[in-house]
């Protein structure tokens, strides 16, 4: 999903959702 892709580009979101990346 594009939302997960955007989260993958955000370091803060990546930390909170490391399982998505």
UniProtKB/Swiss-Prot annotation:
Q: In which tissues is it expressed?
A: Expressed by the venom duct.
A Pfam family matched by this chain, by name? Toxin_8
The alphabetical list of record keywords is: Acetylcholine receptor inhibiting toxin, Amidation, Disulfide bond, Neurotoxin, Postsynaptic neurotoxin, Secreted, Toxin
- Identify the GO cellular component terms for this protein: extracellular region; host cell postsynaptic membrane
Q: Where in the cell is it found?
A: Secreted
Which parts of this chain are annotated as the region Ser-Xaa-Pro motif, crucial for potent interaction with nAChR? 9-11
- Disulfide linkages recorded for this protein, renumbered to the chain, are 7-13, 8-21
Q: What does its UniProt record remark on the domains?
A: The cysteine framework is I (CC-C-C). Alpha4/7 pattern.
What family, per the record? Belongs to the conotoxin A superfamily.
Q: What else is known?
A: Negative results: does not inhibit rat alpha-7/CHRNA7, alpha-4-beta-2/CHRNA4-CHRNB2, alpha-4-beta-4/CHRNA4-CHRNB4, alpha-3-beta-4/CHRNA3-CHRNB4, alpha-2-beta-2/CHRNA2-CHRNB2, alpha-2-beta-4/CHRNA2-CHRNB4, and alpha-1-beta-1-gamma-delta/CHRNA1-CHRNB1-CHRNG-CHRND acetylcholine receptors, as well as on human alpha-9-alpha-10/CHRNA9-CHRNA10 subtype.
Q: What is this protein called?
A: Alpha-conotoxin CIC
Q: In which organism is this protein found?
A: Conus catus (Cat cone)
